[in-house]
Amino acid sequence: MKQNNIYLVGFMGSGKTSILKKIKQIVNANTIDLDENIEKKYGSINKIFQTKGEKYFRNIELETFQALPDNDTVIALGGGSLEVSHILDEVKNSELSFYLKDTFENLWKRIANSERPLVKKGKEEISELYKLRENLYNQSKHIIDIKNKKEKIIAETIIQNTWLKNEVI
């Protein structure tokens, strides 16, 4: 098990990457965006979905996750990462997992016009996906309601619940 890593989880558009960058800016932490790591090694996630499918993507997502550092890193997971059982187990067993929670309507406003591969399925299907994934996200140790909150406040909340209380890094 990866010790003392901090996991940011949430649906597409929840701001995982933005919050990750804000945390790095505030405390100069080691940070990794899982999707960015995948794109560096394998190319565009959109293209992977289009040419090889979601199952192939989830396999390389797991492979990339397993290659991550074992400790003291803030990691933004992909929106569907918790569908991979090994990744879900790591997050469930971590005291430092944070679900960035928002309403589907707010998230849809942020992603509706994006190039994300799953968005092409339409609002109704994505709403169903959100409901399914929400059960996975809710297994995080900490749930942060991000509705109408600034990125800096969200990042500071995560920092206060890790560095100060648990003295992780």
Where are the model-predicted features located?
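NTP-dependent small-molecule kinase module
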Residues: M1-Q3, S18, K22, I26, ...
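Hydrophobic anchor at the beta1->P-loop junction of P-loop NTPases
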Residues: L8
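P-loop (Walker A) phosphate-binding loop of NTP-binding proteins
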Residues: F11
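Conserved glycine(s) of the Walker
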Residues: G15
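Post-Walker A helix-loop "phosphate-sensing" segment adjacent to the P-loop in P-loop NTPases
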Residues: Q25-L34
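ATP-dependent small-molecule kinase phosphotransfer cores
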Residues: E36-D89
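Short glycine-rich anion-binding loops that position phosphate/pyrophosphate groups of nucleotides
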Residues: G78-L82, T103-E105, K149
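A glycine- and Lys/Arg-enriched "phosphate-lid" helix/loop adjacent to the NTP-binding pocket
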Residues: S94-N135
